[in-house]
A protein has these predicted regions:
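Small-molecule-sensing regulatory modules
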Residues: 1-19, 32, 135-350
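Generic structural signal for residues in well-ordered beta-strands
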Residues: 13-15, 72, 122
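Short, charge-patterned binding micro-sites
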Residues: 21-26, 131, 142
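Short, structured active-site "lid" loops
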Residues: 27-54, 172
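Short, Asp-centered acidic motifs that coordinate Mg2+ and/or phosphate
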Residues: 52-56, 101, 185-186
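A conserved helix-loop-strand patch within extracytoplasmic ligand-binding domains
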Residues: 59-60, 69-118
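Short glycine-rich anion-binding loops that position phosphate/pyrophosphate groups of nucleotides
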Residues: 59-62, 192-194
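Short hydrophobic/aromatic-enriched beta-strand-loop microsegments
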Residues: 74-76, 120-129
Length: 350
């Protein structure tokens, strides 16, 4: 989308795929920003070095601190910002069985799930969107396929297994080949990521309510970073969506001022309505037992400074203590992971 919008302005665009492995990321960046943030920063450093004119990021993955001389040159129109519950049969959250197993590696989603359903068992879930869906769908599909094979061998009147297989979608066929590690009743994904993968209409989903599952700041948005004075004006004129920029600026300002970006479960959602930006923020303890939340209409005329004031009030209302506790947990986890293992939970996932 970014390339096509720039192409429409008769600007020649060449896409460069950058594969940065964990081994290539500086330890200092990983420690300070987390692995995802370190990857984002490594791309931005290529922009500042002149190796790239611009970098395209998922905004929710971007650290709130920006290097000097680097700016968000463009924010295209945002995709849906909320989360969806994905199950093999479209089950809603309140319909999940007691102690159901739900997959996510997002601190925020884990805490929000436990706040809504303390009985749930949350398990880590890694990989891209396709991989996560395959992990969810594999057990039930493999059981059904085996049932049809057994029925055929026993001479029972049942659908032919090969015919059943041809009726499956590609993601279901891939799931049939996947080795099952942990059986899950549901997983939580960003609606935007599922839509961009082209799989949204193929998978049963249920939107999670934004008032209790406040999205990650910037979720659903794309950010194009560039160095000041370079192609910034061209990018901004071609792709910038004013509403999306205002909303994401508010969300990221609240996150930056509250602090605790990659160590605490934090959700911030902003919606531009006329002369005000309706803003909701939610800071949770890791187990979801404590929730600090508030809403405020911020004047669009000074939305950034108003967002900073809103964040300061949140800290005074108890967010600072919740974040301090989260930091202690993160430091304890880091100490236990010094042997080289990855942490189980990350700040945010797909």
């Amino acid at each position: 989308a970014v390339k096509s919008q720039l192409d429409s302005r008769r600007r020649e665009v060449t896409l460069t795929e950058v594969d940065t492995t964990g081994d290539q990321l500086r330890d200092e960046l990983i420690h300070r920003l987390g692995k995802t943030g370190a990857f984002v920063r490594s791309l931005d450093e290529k922009v500042l070095a002149g190796d790239l004119d611009a970098a395209v990021h998922s905004m929710k993955d971007m650290p709130t601190e920006m290097p000097d001389d680097l700016v968000v040159a463009g924010v295209p129109e945002r995709a849906p910002s909320g989360d969806v519950l994905v199950t093999p049969d479209g089950t809603e959250l309140d319909q999940l069985s007691p102690e159901a197993v739900v997959g996510t590696s997002s601190l925020r989603r884990s805490a929000q799930l436990l706040a809504a359903r303390p009985d749930l068992e949350i398990v880590p879930l890694r990989g891209n969107v396709d991989t996560r869906l395959e992990k969810l769908l594999a057990p039930s599909l493999q059981r059904e396929h085996q049932r049809l094979v057994d029925a055929e061998e026993d001479g029972e009147d049942a659908q032919d297994p090969d015919e059943w297989f041809t009726e499956r979608t590609q993601i279901e066929r891939d799931a049939l080949e996947r080795r099952v590690e942990t059986e899950m009743d549901a997983i939580v994904l960003a609606e935007a990521g599922l839509r961009r993968s082209g799989l949204y209409d193929d998978i049963p989903t249920a939107r999670l309510p934004k008032n209790s599952f406040v999205p990650s700041p910037g979720q659903g948005a794309i950010a194009v970073t560039a160095s000041e004075g370079g192609v910034v004006e061209t990018i901004q004129e071609a792709i910038d969506h004013p509403r999306s920029r205002v909303e994401t600026t508010v969300e990221r300002t609240v996150l930056a001022e509250v602090g605790g970006g990659c160590i605490a479960p934090i959700g911030v959602s902003a919606i531009l309505q006329g002369e005000y930006v309706q803003t909701r923020a939610q800071i949770l303890s890791h187990d979801g037992s404590e929730v600090i939340e508030a809403t405020r209409d911020l004047p669009v005329a000074n939305h950034a400074s108003a967002a900073a004031d809103f964040a300061a009030d949140l800290r005074d209302r108890g967010a600072a203590e919740v974040i301090a506790e989260a930091r202690e947990i993160a430091e304890a986890d880091a100490d236990s992971d010094e042997g080289g293992a990855d942490t189980v939970m990350g700040g945010e996932d797909a």
